[in-house]
Amino acid sequence: MLGTLYLCATPIGNLGDMTPRVVETLQTVDVIAAEDTRNSIKLLNHFDIHTPMTSYHEYNKVEKAHQLVGQLLNGQNIALITDAGTPAISDPGEVLVRMCQEQNVPVTSLPGPAACITALTLSGLSTRRFCFEGFLPADKKEKKAILEDLKTESRTMILYEAPHHLIRTLEELYAALGERRITLCRELTKKFETVFPTTLEKALDYYKTEEPRGEYVLVVEGKSPEEKRQEEIASWESMSIEEHMAYYEEQGMDNKSAMKQVAKDRGVGKREIYQYLHGNS
């Protein structure tokens, strides 16, 4: 009989957020796979949990995932926990989940705290559509590519950042996105929880005199529809109307449809485009 992998969300700060279901599961599984056993032992001791632990982290994720899947195939039940929050969100848990799926090992999630969602709900920014970026990569080329993608992102963006990198990241976001609203959250659910709604420019000014402390969740406003529309219009206006027509005709549009789309792009009537083209023909 196959074992089950339990993804157990743990508190991101306030121990009162630990659910009874997670406590019971951690007490009854055969093994707990933890991102940092030294950190997790404090949590387990607090809840009188004495289940054996093993480490599962970024630097052993592939080798250890194979080992854990082997134990699951032999019928052991395993709980996966991260240092704080929900496993597989910005941590190596996804590798283990994927391997379990490949071997048809049951996986279930015990939902609970997640810093990204907690910050989003506190941000005051749009929650209708959002994207999670986690930590920006250290590699400069990779980071540049992601920031380039985010320039046109219309959804609310959620990022994580360490205090010693915060100012640099704010500078990079400001350079890429321009002035945007941002909410900076730190110490979430703890005694000194801070939620700071501001703008990128004002945040940079603020942290020139205030030292960043604690882990941050950054919630950044996406590009507004009006801003995107103005950029599109500027882009189309850099083309001649003939070039604009050719662009759509090369994509397979007939002349009438292309004319209609060109008029829409430029915010003018179709008749105006028609008269221009025939006046210049």
Whereabouts are the PLM-identified features?
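Glycine-rich, flexible N-terminal cofactor/catalytic loop recognition
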Residues: 1-57
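A contiguous loop/helix-start segment that scaffolds small-molecule binding in enzyme catalytic cores
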Residues: 2, 156, 163-281
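Loop/turn-to-beta-strand initiation segments
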Residues: 3-5, 75-79, 155-156
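Short glycine-rich anion-binding loops that position phosphate/pyrophosphate groups of nucleotides
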Residues: 12-13, 83-87, 163-165, 223-225
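Short active-site oxyanion
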Residues: 26-32, 104-108, 156-157
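Conserved helicase motor
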Residues: 54-62, 136-139
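Glycine-centered tight-turn and secondary-structure capping sites
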Residues: 92-94, 255
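Class I SAM-dependent methyltransferase SAM-binding "motif I" and its flanking Rossmann-like core
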Residues: 95-153
